[in-house]
């Protein structure tokens, strides 16, 4: 581990606190980025399975599933890696021990893990480029693919489709999930925990690409 103390700085990050963590069995370094205010936590505990995670506070204001769609969309190509499905390519070629992205009621996280150092650095670079320079900003078709669009069935009747739409349609067909979401709605009527962060199929089509970009 690099020798960092509470006066150290590296790559624009300044150290705020260094402490031992019994729960994590190692040293924890808490830092902040001077220009952006981004917070960084670095844990050194001798674990050979290296883990990186970039996380964002994402507080929904409705049940359109905007952050769930965003989670999917940023992993559909970026400035440095303009392939259609970099996530799938990584799954096929990487030695990753964990590779995923998850949307919660109040945050979205993009974690990767690998025991191979070069593979770990590659995964980290791909994920950072995905979240900070995604192709979705220039290509609305990614939104329609991952969020929602309209197709015609064999009789010419319109049908809603989309990766997230279909996923949440399946999830919300479960009675337990419906009861759970209704319970949250009653318990938290005035904050983010009352909304369906994954997206309610009844409301996902309310989201436009223009609203998504905001």
Can you describe what each PLM-predicted range is?
Residues 134-166:
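Acidic/histidine-enriched alpha-helical segments
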Residues 38-39, 94-96, 211:
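Short structured motifs
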Residues 26-31, 166-214:
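Histidine-acidic residue clusters that define the catalytic metal-binding segment
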Residues 2-47:
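N- or domain-start disorder-to-order transition segments that initiate the globular core
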Residues 109-113, 145-153, 168, 200-201:
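Conserved short loop/turn motifs at secondary-structure junctions
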Residues 44-129, 133, 141, 173-177, ...:
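M16/MPP (pitrilysin/insulinase) zinc-metallopeptidase core fold and M16-derived inactive scaffolds
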Residues 21, 31-32, 44, 90, ...:
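A general structural signal for short secondary-structure junctions and capping/turn motifs
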